[in-house]
């Protein structure tokens, strides 16, 4: 395989100009010989005495070039003047020794050998082409059987296998009328005589005529391979090799170690084996040795070549002297240490250094402190240049000396060189693009890099010994890009969610909080001040304190109509601290933003507001000032932690005693047998959970308030100045939960498997733990540490897969012109709005006009980017859904358009062309991955009981609306009974916006009507949580069928009430075999005794009772619509483990089918049940035209529908987790996207991580990029093959233009790993996973990599087609086209 075009330095081929694609194919023997500079005939490497390479050996200088620059081997020709001369004595050409890195040799094999990649990588390509099984081909190749290559006139079949005995018998019988061969020769003969074009024709006909699915799949696969060979002009027999290329010697070096030993590359060993065996075989053939010996030697040669190409792929791996398997050519390129991931995608670079980081609290945001020693080393060449320019040194050598002596002038020059020259800092792991940022260096003494505290959040850095790397951008372009795009002060917003990432934390927050808190009756309370300067004087002369409440006149800056600032003076009631803080506010930011106690969230809002109102530059300056102020007041405040700050609540002892008494009572009940062990455990856990909460509440009440005397002399409560409370309250450090452990009680602990230990830890850290309590605590804590280590690796792998699947998504055009999009609504769960509509549509582009619901006028036209102003307007006008453009529906073929993506979150305006949005999406989802939990949650005691709700209440005033799936009937009492499966009551506020959405189960009684006005707290619906009713939709007289006591039903009498009921028995447990198949059903008769039919059909109403149903009606009873026929007791809802955290995100993106997946209705129609099989029930859905769709469902599963019920396509009919593939098939792309976005967001929301929906949508786009051809039409695709969506669109457009029939296709959902591997670019796929398979397939297909993605371009070393690289490539293409046009024109004129 000529993979080598990946590796050889491209200059040698005279390819100075850029290339735009790389093609891979199978090398023909002629090609291999044309690469070669001579045949390697001997296995010798170098002479152990002279260290000179042996002639014709593996390191031969005659073949591969001289060992020393411009010097032949025997030393006759030396120096440059003989360049190009070939020495007549030793035959070596005089040239540079680096040609030994690129000159190849070859080995002429004495017998053909099959290439193991085409034989063994599944599915076997040789097997596919020849239509033989891998086992058969191996038997032929490894000389266990003959294969008939030409049957002649005999009854033998072509490709038939014969054992040795068979062969000799047939020889006796038919003489030489037929040909049969053994080994690679036989296979090669078969390949050579295969008529590819004819075979394709036959297969196409077979495809038309056959009906079986497996056959179609098999034929389609074979067809694909044969067509690829036909198209690319490669010959089938090239998969069998006559000539073996030999890698250039400097790529498989042999290095002499001291003591006469050698370190060598494994490849040399492998090559030696091949040459030895090949030479032995040649000799045997010359001697006409017996067949059996020759065959053995040929087999050994085949095995030696196998090992060289891919050791260990077949049989045992060849091992070296030390028993470890040798590293073959295939091992060189695959895996983490292989060529792709080690050397091509990540390289070590020059002009870099690393050191420990420390705090630089006096720096400005765009600066960092760089140790002088490091700077001197990093900027050496610049310093040499300056020294020479200033005449202080005449040569580089002299300059070097000066620098090493560190003469004073050098430091002055260093200052000069470093000025305005940004450097890049990087902290590993680089999880998102903010892991590398540019700074202007400030020279400092010492050896540690100083980092600005506000960028720590982006780097996820702290100062407990973290190290960071420094890189110097050298070229002018690189410096420009670093300064304009990467400078820390240009990256204020996070690309994941558009919120500021430069947010103060810890000490700064604490200082600002302390500064802006107010105190009751502080010194000088109630004073009035003329301006801030006066406040300053009063504060510094100690007339007032920091927290004193005062009134002050403040000057604010407001924009007028012309957009210029003018001062406005207002009086504010505020505190001294806030008034002082107002001085650093940027122009245009109102004072009310700081006129409150600043906690972390408030500070974040403050910076966000500043960015939106005052722009980037002012915000950066403001952030810096906030930092200096915060640090200053944190120091002056002297807030520290003392043991006495952890106040233990007085009520603790009483609360503990109470809880202990309750537990004792439960234990007694358990001993008397009144409760089961499970109930006892749940209740005990419950009691202790509540006790812990009560103690925590008492403690917080105690901590958060303190009694003070106000000016009037009354005792009042004010917020406490307890240090620990202030730290937690401000959001600087710690939380209520941690304070609870310090001075409340530690509470319940979990075992490593997630279950809760019922003995709580009643002490806290201040009191100290007993030995037993300490042991219980360590149990779960250790799990946490193990989790964290695993989590990091898993999260990294998820990120890698995400990056791989999206790496070629770049914004390439401004607008694709589509009007498709998704309808966005607020996310409502239960009764709460989790994410408001404005947050979901902010920064998107509208797909259709947004219309005011009350007046009907257009608020926003289609194609508008929604800014803060616009979304606020939409919000106020009461619009509850907006159709916006989304990456999933973008029509751009390779890449995305700016309008479908919307706002670039990190810049706050429409995304630029060239932005690598795919990678940004992958990083935004992967980066918080390390914060997600690994554990799958077990719902503990307290949570599972809350699940058995029996009614639902409105939380707000408004109007009740029923969802479109809502189906209900009114019963005789006039109650509305729900008979639909996925019914919801939605509550809209007075302007028609959705406020809450409640699911209502089947059989619930609705207490509201559609369109009714309701009050908060009103009950909307009630139901019995413990049973599931079976409800009739028709009225009539009950007539039972197959309801026989003792056969299909059993009578049960309640001991307490004495009432008897009928319960349906499970078919397996019935006595006679005949009764096993009987299904107890109920039919309805009208007053004339005729069976009632389903309206509009002639099918009688018939409803089957499921197993375990308690029948509540009697034979002959008159019933009305909505009456209950039977109740099915619900098993107390089993606590299903919900997969949470990282594994859940991975599961969604890998599009895995969930365990125990639920089932959706394939068609809209009526449900009935067919004949049961042993463990399964047969569920039939019949549509309006009477077409039935059957499925078998195992009896353990809970079927949510019953006989005669009408279901809609895509509605859930069997309980369980939903399979995303089903959603796509039955409900379409929008429903699927909504499901995945919702589920992924759910996981991140639990951890309090904000990620913009569009990142998830970008990944969904990539998961949906392939389609299955359902009917090829006249497009040349093969029915059933998987192709890129863009290719089908293009082919269909072309077909329609030519008036041909377009192809029909079905959407396919691929998991991210699969999607990465099925990409068009083989280079990208090979560098991701399964390198061997990807390259084999690509070579057979003769694939061409268009180098569209980022990865392929990094690998071949071009500028990536994103950012500035996009414009570079575009202008290059334009120039090239212009040149082509010119040449075409000149040719025309010449002619």
Curated annotation (Swiss-Prot):
GO molecular function: DNA binding; DNA-directed RNA polymerase activity; magnesium ion binding; zinc ion binding
GO CC annotations, alphabetized: DNA-directed RNA polymerase complex
Catalysed reaction, written as an equation: RNA(n) + a ribonucleoside 5'-triphosphate = RNA(n+1) + diphosphate
Keyword Nucleotidyltransferase: yes
First and last residue of the signal peptide: none
Record bears the keyword Magnesium: yes
Enzyme class: transferase
CDD domains in the cross-refs: RNAP_beta'_C, RNAP_beta'_N
Annotated GO biological process: DNA-templated transcription
Record text on cofactor binding: Binds 1 Mg(2+) ion per subunit. Binds 2 Zn(2+) ions per subunit.
SMART domains (alphabetical): RPOLA_N
Keywords: DNA-directed RNA polymerase, Magnesium, Metal-binding, Nucleotidyltransferase, Transcription, Transferase, Zinc
The EC number(s) this enzyme carries: 2.7.7.6
Binding-site residues, Mg(2+): 462, 464, 466
Residues reported in the UniProt entry to bind Zn(2+) 2: 816, 890, 897, 900
Residues the entry annotates as binding Zn(2+) 1: 72, 74, 87, 90
Cofactor: Mg(2+); Zn(2+)
Functional summary from the UniProt entry: DNA-dependent RNA polymerase catalyzes the transcription of DNA into RNA using the four ribonucleoside triphosphates as substrates.
Complex and partners: The RNAP catalytic core consists of 2 alpha, 1 beta, 1 beta' and 1 omega subunit. When a sigma factor is associated with the core the holoenzyme is formed, which can initiate transcription.
Family as reported in the entry's similarity comment: Belongs to the RNA polymerase beta' chain family.
Record-given protein name: DNA-directed RNA polymerase subunit beta'
Protein's organism: Neisseria meningitidis serogroup C (strain 053442)
